[in-house]
Curated annotation (Swiss-Prot):
Region (Esterase domain-2): 297-351
Region (Fusion domain-2): 352-637
Source organism of this protein record: Influenza C virus (strain C/Taylor/1233/1947)
Positions of region (N-acetyl-9-O-acetylneuraminic acid binding): 83-297
Extracellular side of membrane: 1-617
Protein name: Hemagglutinin-esterase-fusion glycoprotein
Gene3D superfamilies: 2.20.70.20, 3.90.20.10
Pfam families noted in UniProt: Hema_esterase, Hema_HEFG, Hema_stalk
Keyword RNA-binding: no
Role played: Binds to the N-acetyl-9-O-acetylneuraminic acid residues on the cell surface, bringing about the attachment of the virus particle to the cell. Plays a major role in the determination of host range restriction and virulence. Class I viral fusion protein. Responsible for penetration of the virus into the cell cytoplasm by mediating the fusion of the membrane of the endocytosed virus particle with the endosomal membrane. Low pH in endosomes induce an irreversible conformational change in HEF2, releasing the fusion hydrophobic peptide. Several trimers are required to form a competent fusion pore.
Subunit-structure text: Homotrimer of disulfide-linked HEF1-HEF2.
Length: 642
């Protein structure tokens, strides 16, 4: 009889790369980065489709006769906007004659404003003021600020008021022989007498706590008054000095102008200019006192519930060729912390006409159709990778990637994986540091590792039989390192908050620190991933070694009395008793079934954070249990000896 020895032998050649891990090493035919770099998409997007609302005009108005050619958004996104062609929030606030007057109201955690162009220099609104850009800037800034602190907002288009009997609603020649709806102009018709100027005006208005279904915790009110260049211009009838002042219920001055105590401009001119300051006022009863002849009475407000902080996106709103625009929206964005601006790079070129349906704007606003994982001034991201090539400009919200270089992202083994023995990778002398990770976060943190060091992560689980680390202990190592990473990050945030408290007066210092912190977080995360990679490699190596023994056991069972196992993974067979077909049945499963495999490697890692990026406690979660790579028959050679 001819006896032969058949063994399982792992095939490794120069095409394999070696990967070291905690508890075991691997040879692999391929490797891949744990994450790829992502690139943000320019424009606007939202974190949650169910929690945002838009405020717009004809470019988001589905009722426009030229829709969808007139729109800069999709039909789906247009449904989320409160819009009317020709409208704007400021037009509805002041109500100039002949302009669209739309009741803007709605609720959402994230508010997108794409309006404003309908009140611009092209509109040529006069009413005692030819250039309203500075008032528009102040108005938009206050709208964005209050919207970022509220869930709901609404125009209040009719305030309760008490008007003095001696005044009547007036008009003005330089306001199309009409006047604004807010403020309303009231005048006194005075017959020649000793009191030729009439009497001082005293009126009252009430800011409600609720308007329809909308709760009002704070109102935006326009406090308007005339500015005279000199006392003589106003005092043509011997009316003394001009004043128009608003008082709260306690008698405190909250807005207006009083030339009895404040100087006139000193300029030369015969026509006054109207100025409107934006006041943030609580609900309640207010009084207005003015000098005789004129009374400018607040008639409208925007009310805000101030229930939750939210996100605000302002979209640049400009005309196409031939019409003059302003940049109040852009400037208001710069003045509003946490506000994101979507800005064109090219002139507006419309499809429906010169001013409606711009392709660039459609691309910039296309992200509103989707949910993003991260939105920022640099753009939006919906990929799951935690890294991007460039630093994302703040503000940013959601699960935003950190800046990193591609070569710094750890690589993991892929393709055909073959374990080493494992006996040469046991940690016998624990270290007191993990990759110096305590130095990664600009000296803010110190990581105290238990006396067992790395061995503590593997719970000191050396196999009694001599080599390797158990799969169970490696999995426990994942749990332990995950907990320590959470502690590390919690300590980071506490230190960051303390530093922020110390330098809140210095905005540039905050910006510099923010960048430093983000860079440190990126470095720390890369360090954490390096640890996880090493645990992954060790865990897979251990599992693959176990799978080899399982395969050997299966072969022994199939062979029965036809083969004798003389050492782990080696059998003696009588060639005369068990021919080639017999051997194929035993060792190749008669090629009718593959060698039992284990599920493929899944290294998906999900970085979780609060909806608001800064100050959040980042958490690291392995979303699925780490599984083992498949062993295929082509990865095993059968070595025969006589």
């Amino acid at each position: 009889a001819e006896k032969i020895k058949i063994c399982l032998q792992k095939q490794v050649n120069s095409s394999f790369s070696l990967h070291n891990g905690f508890g075991g090493n691997l040879y692999a035919t391929e490797e891949k980065r744990m994450f790829e770099l992502v690139k943000p998409k320019a424009g606007a997007s939202v974190l949650n489709q169910s929690t945002w609302i838009g405020f717009g005009d004809s470019r988001t108005d589905k009722s426009n006769s030229a829709f969808p050619r007139s729109a800069d958004v999709s039909e789906k996104t247009a449904d989320k906007f409160r819009s009317l062609s020709g409208g704007s929030l400021m037009l509805s606030m002041f109500g100039p004659p002949g302009k669209v007057d739309y009741l803007y109201q709605g609720c959402g955690k994230h508010k997108v404003f794409y309006e404003g162009v309908n009140w611009s220099p092209h509109a040529a609104i006069n009413c005692y003021r030819k250039n309203w850009t500075d008032i528009k800037l102040n108005f938009q800034k206050n709208i964005y600020e209050l919207a970022s602190q509220s869930h709901c907002m609404s125009l209040v288009n009719a305030l309760d008021k008490t008007i003095p009997l001696q005044v009547t609603a007036g008009v003005a020649k330089n306001c199309n022989n009409s006047f604004l709806k807010n403020p309303a102009l009231y005048t006194q018709e005075v017959n020649p007498s000793k009191e030729i100027c009439g009497k001082e005006n005293l009126a009252f208005f009430t800011l409600p706590t609720q308007f329809g279904t909308y709760e009002c915790k704070l109102h935006l009110v326009a406090s308007c008054y005339f500015i005279y260049d000199s006392k003589e211009v106003y005092n043509k009838r011997g009316c003394d000095n001009y004043f128009q002042v608003i008082y709260d219920s306690s008698g405190k001055v909250v807005g207006g102008l009083d030339n009895r105590v404040s100087p006139y401009t000193g300029n030369t001119g015969d026509t006054p200019t109207m100025q409107c300051d934006m006041l943030q006022l609580k609900p309640g009863r207010y009084s207005v006192r003015s000098s005789p002849r004129f009374l400018l009475m607040p008639e409208r407000s925007y009310c805000f519930d101030m229930k939750e902080k939210g996100l605000v996106t302002a979209v640049q709103s400009v005309w196409g060729k031939g019409r003059e625009s302003d940049h109040a929206v852009d400037q208001a964005y710069l003045s509003t912390p946490g506000c994101m601006l979507i800005q064109k790079q090219k002139p507006y070129i419309g499809e429906a006409d010169d001013h409606h349906g711009d392709q660039e704007m459609r691309e910039l606003l296309s992200g509103l159709d989707y949910e993003a994982r991260c939105i920022s001034q640099s753009g939006w991201v919906n990929e799951t990778s935690p890294f991007t090539e460039e630093y994302l400009l703040p503000p940013k919200f959601g699960r935003c990637p950190l800046a990193a270089k591609e070569e710094s992202i750890p690589k993991i083994p892929d393709g055909l994986l073959i374990p080493t023995s494992g006996t040469d990778t046991i940690v016998t002398k624990p270290k007191s540091r993990i990759f110096g990770i305590d130095d990664l976060i600009i000296g803010l943190l110190f990581v105290a590792i238990v006396e067992a060091g790395i061995g503590g992560y593997l719970l000191g689980s050396r196999k009694e039989s001599g080599g390797g680390v158990t799969k169970e202990s490696a999995e426990k190592g994942f749990e332990k390192i995950g907990n320590d990473i959470q502690i590390l990050r919690s300590s980071t945030n506490i230190a960051i908050e303390k530093l922020n408290d110390r330098i809140t007066h210095d905005e540039q210092a905050i910006r510099d620190l923010t960048l430093e912190i983000e860079n440190a977080r990126s470095e720390a995360l890369l360090g954490e991933l390096g640890i996880i990679r090493a645990l992954l490699v060790g865990n897979i190596s251990i599992g693959l070694q176990e799978s080899l023994w399982e395969l050997a056991s299966e072969i022994t069972n199939r062979a029965g009395d036809l083969a004798v196992e003389v050492s782990p993974g080696c059998w003696i067979i009588d060639n005369n008793i068990c021919d080639q077909s017999c051997q194929n049945f035993i060792f190749k499963f008669n090629e009718t079934a593959p060698v039992p495999t284990i599920p493929p490697l899944d290294t998906k890692i999900d970085l979780q954070s609060d909806p608001f990026y800064w100050g959040s406690s980042l958490g690291l979660a392995i979303t699925t249990p780490i599984s083992l790579a498949a062993l295929v028959i082509s990865g095993i050679a059968i070595c025969r000896t006589k």
